Amino acid sequence: MTVPAFTVVIPARLASTRLPDKPLADIGGRPMIVRVAERAHASSAQRTVVATDAPAVAQACAAHGIEAVLTRADHPSGTDRLSEVAAQLGLADDAIVVNVQGDEPLIEPSLIDEVALHLAHHADCAIATAAHPLQDIAEVFNPNVVKVVCDAAGRALYFSRAPIPWARDAWSGVPAVPAALAQVPLPGMPVLRHIGLYAYRAGFLRRFPTLAAAPLEQTEALEQLRAMWHGERIAVLQTSAAPAPGVDTPADLERVRALWAQSMAQEGP
């Protein structure tokens, strides 16, 4: 697999309502944002940059040899922040930028490479992302789990918090929010869970802030729908398994800390 040249950008904000100062949370003796950057460094990325509006995050990165750039604090979305960074770095329009979330300290470097490669193989798309089949019916009906449906070429048709596609026959008589999920079967075709990892062409990132917010984006609270509303194509890489868990809450943080310690113990001295 020959991976194209690409840059990883990791947005990081301190203003988390569920887990304050999340990027600076300790995981194995280092801030979480540093652990994420280390995973990105282990990919084939030519450059890894943390994008933050918080000097404390930039200082933590500098202390561990991680490149960081300060951005404006008023960006309405993470993609808008990436747009500013693409301009700051002077990236060419055809350069590939992979957006790795700042709360994914266990992300597989190989997945980062695969998403960058997927975009390189889809010249008709401005964006690439990833998805995996769901095996838990509770996640299918969970609005916090974003689903995606694709066309025959693997391009996204729609992203939604609703259970899509709706299995008319398998779910006949099932209410939109069933009370007894254990009794609801999985549909015959896979329900794909969206993985929040994106590869962009830098030219698209420059255009993104000029695109008007879309009604579907606002209804679902999914910013990728803005790109689709304005006619951009998104290539979806289908993986066989779910990625490692991210960190949204204090409970997530404890789980990731335990998984980190376990992985270090398995590697040995």
From Swiss-Prot:
GO terms for cellular component: cytosol. Its EC number is 2.7.7.38. It is found in: Cytoplasm. The keyword Nucleotidyltransferase applies. InterPro entries: Cytidylyl_trans, KdsB, Nucleotide-diphossugar_trans. It comes from the Bacteria. One of its GO terms (biological process) is CMP-keto-3-deoxy-D-manno-octulosonic acid biosynthetic process. Keywords: Cytoplasm, Lipopolysaccharide biosynthesis, Nucleotidyltransferase, Transferase. PANTHER family: 3-DEOXY-MANNO-OCTULOSONATE CYTIDYLYLTRANSFERASE (PTHR42866), 3-DEOXY-MANNO-OCTULOSONATE CYTIDYLYLTRANSFERASE, MITOCHONDRIAL (PTHR42866:SF2). Activates KDO (a required 8-carbon sugar) for incorporation into bacterial lipopolysaccharide in Gram-negative bacteria. This is 3-deoxy-manno-octulosonate cytidylyltransferase. It comes from Cupriavidus necator (strain ATCC 17699 / DSM 428 / KCTC 22496 / NCIMB 10442 / H16 / Stanier 337). The gene is kdsB.
